[in-house]
Each structure stands twice: as structure tokens, then as C-alpha cells.
Amino acid sequence: DCATVADMAKKAAALEGVDFVCLRLDSADPNGQNAPVEECVETAKAVCEAIDKPLVIAGCKSIEKDAALVEKIAEALQGKNVLYLSAREENYKGVAAAVGLAYGQKVGAESAVDINLAKQLNVLISQIGLDTKNVVMNVGSAAAGYGLEYVISTMERVCSAALTQNDTMLQMPIITPVGAETWSVKESVATEEDMPQWG
């Protein structure tokens, strides 16, 4: 009953307890389908128009392609309530400038499960002129096991420094996009034949 991505997003937005909808542009991956930027922009516009919740847009994890994607999508969705994942150390200038400075939208600052890297990236983004009120931290994510525990430990350290030490460079909200990580865990992709005891 969902013919398009926008239909899926509308259905997801209507679910009880949903605060926002995340659109992952995996089809843009140059090592996969390599969907053109223009097609991804049209998809993002359709999803944004279909939902009444804030929209989070995640790229395809290709630094070059994501830079092109976020700039064009931010331009097309100017004035909308959108958070873009993610600005990383390798591309923060382009992403933060295109999304935050040029179009006044929100930027996710992605670091690799390390409080010092998270703070450093926040400082760098603020130094290019982006208001920290438009930054959301993505301190890393994991779906299970030690990785998840390490992510939670990092988040606790960030919150502790932000609150007890009044560290303004760690006082941004945190988002942890775990959903995509779940598909890299063997329990999610194992067939019933491989692991019959899991059902």
C-alpha cells in the first residue's frame, strides 16, 4: 500500500510516538545504485511535503556525493524544519556552510564515538559562523554489544561535561541513528535456516 518513498514516510509519520522521520538516501551511493542528485532532491521534496513532522535527511556515506546532495536538498527545502546528517571532520566546512549558513537549517555533527572528537567538531563548526543552536551531535552509533555500550558511555560523558562543567561546546542535543546500524548485525540478517533457534 506504499507505492513511493513519500507514501512510506507519510505512513511512518502517522505511527504513534513518532517525533520525526529520517530519510536515508542510500540509493545515491556511488558504489551502489548511484542515483543522481536531482532524483534525490525530488524524493526529499516529496517526503517533506507528505509529512507533518520534522525531517532528518541522511546521505549515503560518500563524502563527495553527500556534499552535493545536502547543498541541493537544503536549497530545495529552504524554510523547512530539516536536520542534515552529517557533517564530519572531512566535510564539515562544506556541509555546515551549505546547510546552516546559506539556508538556515540544522546540521548533524558526526564524530567517531569520542568525546574529544565530538567537541572538536562542534568548535570547528561554530568557528565558521554557524550558531550552535543549529547543531545536533551524532556521537556515533552501534546496534548491539560492546559498540552500543561504548556509544552510551560516550553520551554519558558528553552529558556530564555539558551539565557539570558547563561546557557549551557539548550542550547540543544528541541524535543516534541506530536504525541503519541494525542491518549490519548478524542477528538482523541471518536466515531462519542459518539460525533456527532465533525463529
Residue ranges and their predicted role:
Residues 1, 19-23, 53-59, 80-87, ...:
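Hydrophobic faces of well-ordered beta-strands that scaffold small-molecule active sites
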Residues 1-7, 11, 32-35, 59-63, ...:
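Active-site mouth loops of central-metabolism enzymes
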Residues 4, 32-42, 65, 113-116, ...:
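Alpha-helix N-cap and loop-to-helix initiation/capping positions
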Residues 5-14, 42-44, 93-96, 123-125:
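Short, charged beta->alpha transition segments
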Residues 12, 73, 137:
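Conserved, mostly hydrophobic/aromatic
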Residues 17-46, 51, 57-63:
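Glycine-rich, proline-tolerant flexible connector loops at the mouths of alpha/beta enzymes
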Residues 36-45, 71-81, 192-198:
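Short, electropositive alpha-helical surface patch
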Residues 90-199:
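Catalytic alpha/beta core domains of metabolic enzymes, predominantly
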